[in-house]
Structures are given as C-alpha cells and as structure tokens.
Amino acid sequence: MDYNRMNSFLEYPLCNRGSSAYSAHSAPTSFPPSSAQAVDSYASEGRYGGGLSSPAFQQNSGYPAQQPPSTLGVPFPSSAPSGYAPAACSPSYGPSQYYPLGQSEGDGGYFHPSSYGAQLGGLSDGYGAGGAGPGPYPPQHPPYGNEQTASFAPAYADLLSEDKETPCPSEPNTPTXRTFDWMKVKRNPPKTAKVSEPGLGSPSGLRTNFTTRQLTELEKEFHFNKYLSRARRVEIAATLELNETQVKIWFQNRRMKQKKREREGGRVPPAPPGCPKEAAGDASDQSTCTSPEASPSSVTS
C-alpha cells in the first residue's frame, strides 16, 4: 500500500480547509507503515471532505464509498478537488472521537483528535467535557440542537411559570368591598312636609301640616273671599311662607267642606249680628262671630 500517496491525499484537504475548520493541534502527515489489515468498522471516518470517493482509491485502500456530509447532518461544503478522494484515516488509527467546535465555526466541522501519538494522548481528555463521547460516528443532530438547548429548558420553564402566576390582588375598595349591617337595612325616610318656595308645586302624596297662624290667616281670607285671584293667591302664599299650590288646594278643600255642611243642615243658619253674610255658615269656626242663636250642631262642629 502506498502511504506516501495516501499522505498526499490527506495533506491537500487539510491545508485547504481554512483556519476555522480544524483545531490548532493538527496531526502529523507522515505515519509509519503498519501491517494491520483494513477493516470496515471505520468506513465512515472521513468527515472533512465532501462528495463520493473515487473507485481507484477504494481499490487501493480497501475502504467502501464514503457517505456525503448531507447524510450526517453536517452543513459544510467540500473543499477537495474533483480528482481526489476525501481525507481518510489510516487503518492503524484507533477509534475516533468527534467534538463539536465553538459557535464561531460556520461550516459545522468536528474536531478529530488523533489517538496514535503520546504527545496528543491527553487531547481527547481535554476536549472530552464538551464532546459527544467515544464512537466512530458524530452525533446525529446539528450543533445547538436538543442537547445544547436542554440546559436552557429549566430557565425557560421558570420564566414561563413566573408569567403564569396570578398577579397580586389589588387592594379592595373600602366603599364597595366592606358591607356593614346598617347598609343592608332598607330604610324608608319619613315623609315630612317641607316648606317649598312660593310659586312651586308641592310634591305629590305629601300632606301639609299647617301651623295655627297659617290656619287663622287662611280662615280670615276665606270669610271675605271664597275664590281668590291669582295675584291674591301669590300674595297670601308669600305672606304665610307657603307656595301657591298649597294655598289653592286649601281653598278648594275649604269650599267642599262648606258645601257639605249646607247639604247636611238643609239651610244656612242666619249670620249673627256684626258678621258678614258670607261667613254665616262658618260662624261656629270663627271666635269673633259667636252668638247665642247659633245652633248646637254648628257650635260643636
């Protein structure tokens, strides 16, 4: 077997790969001859070249056809010329180990330490921490695959768990959150008559409680005028601190009461001396118009 020719095949692609494809610790290009037989267990160790090997090289070295990098998931192109076979290891090489290079390598190459020299014996141990373990094949996944991202999974899981946590409950509003016992009781305010401004109508459904002074002034006005004009009604309301509607309703009720007394008595009693005729029916209600001729019914009423 012509090892000089094989070394020339190895040297050419190694010198033309570029500085980013291999480690600084390169293996020597000349090897002592070996009588070991060619075996097929390391048939796919040519990881640096691309394309298929030539038939002549397969006959000389006894190696089967090399697999293209596309089948291994390595995205680097081939730098070997068309007339040369890809770089391959000598049969005297031991089992190879492949270690992925750093992130700066863009061609996705693997570091291939040599196991034949004593000066490079500890090289595989130095790179063993970041490698994929012993074996003739590189890992079946591209760099930064599931193995590299697995270390970030706990950190991402923690971030997701923090995002899914329920936010802190906001402080409850005191007026709406706290309900006291006295707030549950439905309270109906008492209906009390309040003095309204003159000229405004009183609320419906409320009974006005007149004072003694107001009743006295209204009775005096009723004895002289059973029907009031608009101007007189506004004047009386302003004097008695009432509104116009209250004065109007009081005079309506007072006229109805007078008619009821006339129907019950049959006739209007004669007016006492000194009293006007209009106030004859109301003689019993007037303290100034009393006479001994007044009927008992009118006095009691």
UniProtKB/Swiss-Prot annotation:
Residues 203-262 bind DNA. The lineage of its organism: Eukaryota, Metazoa, Chordata, Craniata, Vertebrata. Residues 19-77, 127-149, 189-208, 254-301 are annotated as: Disordered. The keyword Acyltransferase does not apply. Residues 19-38, 55-70, 284-301 have a biased composition (Polar residues). The keyword Transmembrane helix does not apply. InterPro entries: HD, HD_metazoa, Homeobox_CS, Homeodomain-like_sf, HXA1/B1/D1. It comes from the Eukaryota. This is Homeobox protein Hox-B1. Sequence-specific transcription factor which is part of a developmental regulatory system that provides cells with specific positional identities on the anterior-posterior axis. Acts on the anterior body structures. Keywords: Developmental protein, DNA-binding, Homeobox, Nucleus, Transcription, Transcription regulation.
